[in-house]
């Protein structure tokens, strides 16, 4: 069983996908929003959510895990927002670097990041370049793809998101395959 630390955990949607495989168990979650945290704890009764702002979480407080997952806030990169990126006046753009702080300290075998599909093209590709450079600096090998929720899990929702999967070991990356789509049978 692979252990998971979940950041920007929300209500646990990404965790659910991992746990439903039967191979992963979320052992730590960090979520600042109290309502989302409460729902997460109802969905995962064995996990007490760390509700501190990620800036205030010492890396020593996060257990060493095999996997780190994080759907870092997307408002700074979304075409629906002001697209201020890392310069977002509310500080949401730089939260990716807090996630990288956790990856650097924890050194998980695998990290998965989720965000809006516009992340790749934001600021003429500079934002995504910075993200890739951070992963390179930490010695991770990665792949990414834009997936639409309605093609995975029989969900009648047109929701395109980018997923970045990073592996500490390049052999693990070479063994990785993106999931096959599932025909939509519900509308």
Model-predicted segments: where are they?
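Class I SAM-dependent methyltransferase "Motif I" SAM/SAH-binding loop
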Residues: 7-12
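Conserved SAM-binding strand-loop segment of SAM-dependent methyltransferases
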Residues: 46-53
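Extreme N-terminal starter segment of soluble prokaryotic enzymes
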Residues: 1-4
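A short, Lys/Arg-enriched amphipathic alpha-helix followed by its capping loop at the start of a domain
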Residues: 17-25, 43
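The conserved SAM/SAH-binding core of class I Rossmann-like methyltransferase domains
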Residues: 30
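Conserved SAM-binding loop
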Residues: 40
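Conserved SAM/SAH-binding beta-strand->alpha-helix loop
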Residues: 33-34
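Class I S-adenosyl-L-methionine
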Residues: 57-65, 75-187
